[in-house]
């Protein structure tokens, strides 16, 4: 299983695409993302919405000064 991350600005511009994990279950990856979102740093506050859909995990993140969407494609 391979996890590819595509980071997109609110404008739709793709910022980065990279393979970030191999050989992890979808549940474990989803939990890692939820944990990252829950680990809210007072110096860098953020809010996240995380959901699974059609073999993808989508994360919408808002910080003080920006908003972005990260879509994780999961391949077997």
Predicted feature residues:
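A short, exposed loop/beta-hairpin motif centered on an aromatic-Gly-Thr core
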Residues: 13-24
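N-terminal compositionally biased, intrinsically disordered segments and leader/signal-like regions
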Residues: 7-9, 18, 32, 48, ...
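Short aromatic-glycine-(Arg/Gly/Cys) micro-motifs in beta-strand/loop hairpins
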Residues: 1-15
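Compositionally biased, low-complexity segments enriched in small residues
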Residues: 2-4, 22-28
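A short, charged, amphipathic alpha-helix used as a generic interaction element across diverse proteins
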Residues: 25-44
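Short, mixed-charge low-complexity intrinsically disordered segments
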Residues: 39-76
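Generic "edge-of-domain/loop-turn" microfeature
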Residues: 10-12, 26, 66-68
């Amino acid at each position: 299983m391979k996890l590819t991350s595509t980071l997109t600005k609110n404008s739709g511009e793709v910022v980065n695409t990279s393979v970030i994990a191999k050989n992890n279950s979808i549940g474990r990856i989803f939990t890692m993302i939820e944990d990252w979102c829950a680990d809210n740093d007072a110096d860098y506050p953020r809010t996240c919405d995380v959901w699974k859909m059609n073999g993808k995990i989508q994360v919408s993140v808002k910080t003080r000064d920006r908003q972005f969407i990260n879509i994780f494609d999961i391949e077997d």
